[in-house]
């Protein structure tokens, strides 16, 4: 899906989140937003961040879903958007503060209709039974885990630690992966979509930067390079989702010492609807959640392997496309500035022997 330009006088409505720099932009009085505009934390040079955003999006788009398409705002687009957005919010609002923050690099992406996510925890850290049940229903589908495996293959390559954090992955135990951001596992209908593939918050060492010379993100790349690590990594990811749900179903405690109290009761079990007409409901005990997704390890692993293979084919095709033609033993000079794969991606490919 193409990302529409922000032209002068085209912005007719802007809404935004209060907790993070995310805005929804309506163009030309259309009935729904056309764009999402998001502020990414700057880590290093602006051009490095822009290259990383573009290439992370390209890879996820080709491996996972054509709706994934992120592009940095052009300066003229930023000016048009900011003028409209400033008028939409009170000067002391969180949205206005985000717009004035010089630490963000602003990107745009198409607005995806009917988008949902796997976040089941409220802002006050409480958990609703209905939200838990809905998330359980989503993760009890084989296709979800296969899609998620493909998304995570790209995440491993670009060092996106904002879905799963694998920095403490223990291959021997099949553990050590955490579900880093519940809201960053997103769905269009019953399918997982890998929006927001670039994550800079923990990339200060250059690991998340696709435009750098050093091949960073080595722990993630090692999982991609060694097929023997992948089954245990797949198990660790399914366990990460189980562990988070199991923990949150146990309620939440508040206060200290004698004043400590449970502000949300434990969910001993939940009953969910299923897609099976012969067994329309399923009772899930909290204790069973610990191993609930183990049967989906093979689906996640299949997606991970397929995603890695598709990513390799895509990048090798790009490498061939951008290579300068050779005639008479010499490379012809380019008639115009040459397109190229960022050095950081080439280094990652070399590390993976691609």
Give each language-model segment a name.
Residues 110, 122-128, 132-136, 140, ...:
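Catalytic and binding regions of secreted/periplasmic enzymes and modules that target cell-wall glycans
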Residues 9, 16, 34, 78-79, ...:
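General helical secondary-structure elements
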Residues 29, 70-71, 89-98, 122-129, ...:
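Short, flexible coil/linker elements and helix-boundary hinge sites characteristic
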Residues 172-181, 187-354:
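C-terminal catalytic region of ATP-dependent kinase domains
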Residues 128-197, 201:
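Conserved kinase catalytic-core segment
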Residues 1-121, 126-127, 153-161, 168, ...:
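Conserved ATP-binding subdomain of kinase catalytic cores across diverse folds
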């Amino acid at each position: 899906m193409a990302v529409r330009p922000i032209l002068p006088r085209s912005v007719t409505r802007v809404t935004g989140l209060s907790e993070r720099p995310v805005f929804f932009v309506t163009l030309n009085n259309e009935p729904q937003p056309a764009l999402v505009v998001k502020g990414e934390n700057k880590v290093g040079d602006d051009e490095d961040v822009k290259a990383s955003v573009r290439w992370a999006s390209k890879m996820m788009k080709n491996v996972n879903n054509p709706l994934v398409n992120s592009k940095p705002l052009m300066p003229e687009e930023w000016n048009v958007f900011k003028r409209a957005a400033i008028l939409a919010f009170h000067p002391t609002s969180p949205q206005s503060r985000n717009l004035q923050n010089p630490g963000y690099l602003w990107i745009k992406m198409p607005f995806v209709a009917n988008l949902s996510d796997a976040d089941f925890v409220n802002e006050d850290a409480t958990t609703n039974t209905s939200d838990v049940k809905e998330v359980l229903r989503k993760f009890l589908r084989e296709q979800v885990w296969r899609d998620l495996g493909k998304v995570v293959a790209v995440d491993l390559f670009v060092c996106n630690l904002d879905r799963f954090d694998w920095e403490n992955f223990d291959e021997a135990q099949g553990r050590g992966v955490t579900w880093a951001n519940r809201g960053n596992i997103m769905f269009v209908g019953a399918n997982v979509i890998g929006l927001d593939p670039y994550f800079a918050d923990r990339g200060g060492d250059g690991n998340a930067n696709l435009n750098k010379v050093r091949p960073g993100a080595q722990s993630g790349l090692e999982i991609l390079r060694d097929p023997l690590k992948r089954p245990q990594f797949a198990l660790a990811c399914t366990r990460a989702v189980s562990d988070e749900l199991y923990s949150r179903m146990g309620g939440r405690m508040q206060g200290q010492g004698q004043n400590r109290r449970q502000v949300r009761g434990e969910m001993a079990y939940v009953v969910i609807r299923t897609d099976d007409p012969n067994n329309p409901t399923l009772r899930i005990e909290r204790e069973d959640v610990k191993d609930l997704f183990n049967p989906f390890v093979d689906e996640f692993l299949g997606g991970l392997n397929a995603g890695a293979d598709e990513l390799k084919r895509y990048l090798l095709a790009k490498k061939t496309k951008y290579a300068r033609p050779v005639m008479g033993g010499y490379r012809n000079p380019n008639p115009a500035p040459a397109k190229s794969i960022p050095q950081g991606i080439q280094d990652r490919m070399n590390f993976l022997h691609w």
